[in-house]
Amino acid sequence: MLNFRVSGEGKTIVFLHGFLESLTMWDYLPLEQLGSRNIFIDLPGHGKSPLTDNSEHASLEFMADEVIAVLAHLEVTEFSLVGHSMGAYVGLILKQKLESCNLLVLLNSNFWCDNEQKKIDRLRVVKIVLKAKNIFINEAIPNLFWKPELHKDEIKKLKDEALKMSSEAIAYATLAMRDRKDFSKEINQTPSGYVLIHGVYDKLVSISDLESRINSLTQLNIITNAGHMSHIENSEEIMEVLSKIF
């Protein structure tokens, strides 16, 4: 079973971290202020969770099924979910599979599949990671921040944590993201079931790209002075938005 941590009491909110991260990413936010039962989970191959998929094809569906096993173990009957980046990709699958998932909050993420160029880039990452993961990690993590020079300590901590991952786990997650499905139809048909939170300076997904793909009814919250790591770069605004949602 995946590694998890539970804190607080009240309505259940599940938190899923992003690529190269772990459940410790949520420590940057005072989530106890939400007055909820918070469940934090390490996705397969990340943090303290092993990667146990022996199939030939990497998939986010496998990650989602592993999360479902944790929720069943904890006897969760109804919940909301907050997913950061890759965690939201897994969340999209869970939202589709489980009627018990009332709301999905996509934090610095998107809901469409990779284009052909992005798929090529993912394969390039896999080749680099399998040869020298430290090169990839040292380049990738600072680029997630709007102003990396302001977050040297946090970047070092993130790098150290990512370096503990096996090259195989990083490659697996990369390939799983490469082959993910497009959920544009689901989000635009039922906008009340989804909320987007996004850093205005996110280099991975632009605000204009998001705005061009969403229904006018879909709630998009833009975080100022933040890139892809808005929970670190502007935790105060993130908490303001989460407090309004929950």
Segments and roles (model prediction):
Residues 1-13, 33-37, 72, 76-77, ...:
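Alpha/beta-hydrolase fold catalytic core
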Residues 2-53:
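Conserved HGGG/HGGXW glycine-rich cap/lid loop of the alpha/beta-hydrolase fold
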Residues 30, 37-82, 93, 240:
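Active-site loop/oxyanion-hole signature of alpha/beta-hydrolase fold enzymes
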Residues 89-133, 137:
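Flexible "cap/lid" loop of the alpha/beta hydrolase fold
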Residues 114-120, 131-189:
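Conserved alpha/beta-hydrolase catalytic His-Asp/Glu region
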